[in-house]
Amino acid sequence: MARTKQSARKSHGGKAPTKQLATKAARKSAPTTGGVKKPHRFRPGTVALREIRKYQKSTELLNRKLPFQRLVREIAQDFKTDLRFQSHAVLALQEAAEAYLVGLFEDTNLCAIHAKRVTIMPKDVQLARRIRAERA
């Protein structure tokens, strides 16, 4: 490259523009030290719809077995102490309880949709139970 003659310029009290360009270039070319990649986030509702499809396909129990068994034993103790349960009896109770809850949530969802909402609320559960004549 050929050298060119530089003419004198009057300073206006600011920083030299060459320094600014140098720092910008340094920032662009320098590797980012905090290069932690953000985890991928799905749009709201996508994961919920995927879970709905997953659980509608499956037939396994949704509640854990041991916590449900402890709950059954705790409730049964109010009526009679030293009761014993066959494992199949607890499983039958759990199947019935989950079937009841799934049906209740289906009716609750219909009540929310009827109210032009997509979010279920306690008043939807109360209405569904009232229509079923479970609670007057």
From Swiss-Prot:
Record PTM N6-methyllysine, positions in chain: 5, 10, 19, 24, 28, 37
Biased composition (Basic residues): 1-13
Keywords: Acetylation, Chromosome, DNA-binding, Methylation, Nucleosome core, Nucleus, Phosphoprotein
SUPFAM superfamilies (UniProt xref): Histone-fold (SSF47113)
Entry's localization field: Nucleus; Chromosome
Known tissue expression: Expressed in roots, seedlings, leaves, buds and open flowers.
Residue positions where N6-acetyllysine is found in the record: 10, 15, 19, 24
Region ranges (Disordered): 1-43
Molecular function per GO: DNA binding; protein heterodimerization activity; structural constituent of chromatin
Pfam family, one: Histone
Residues with the Phosphoserine modification: 11, 29
UniProt xrefs under InterPro entries: Histone-fold (IPR009072), Histone_H2A/H2B/H3 (IPR007125), Histone_H3/CENP-A (IPR000164)
CC annotations in GO: nucleosome; nucleus
Keyword DNA-binding: yes
Gene3D superfamilies linked: Histone, subunit A
Modified residues (N6,N6-dimethyllysine): 5, 10, 28, 37
PTM annotation (N6,N6,N6-trimethyllysine): residues: 5, 10, 28, 37
Family, similarity comment: Belongs to the histone H3 family.
PANTHER family the record matches: HISTONE H3 (PTHR11426)
Function in brief: Core component of nucleosome. Nucleosomes wrap and compact DNA into chromatin, limiting DNA accessibility to the cellular machineries which require DNA as a template. Histones thereby play a central role in transcription regulation, DNA repair, DNA replication and chromosomal stability. DNA accessibility is regulated via a complex set of post-translational modifications of histones, also called histone code, and nucleosome remodeling.
Record's subunit section: The nucleosome is a histone octamer containing two molecules each of H2A, H2B, H3 and H4 assembled in one H3-H4 heterotetramer and two H2A-H2B heterodimers. The octamer wraps approximately 147 bp of DNA.
Name under which the protein is recorded: Histone H3-like 1
Lineage: Eukaryota, Viridiplantae, Streptophyta, Embryophyta, Tracheophyta
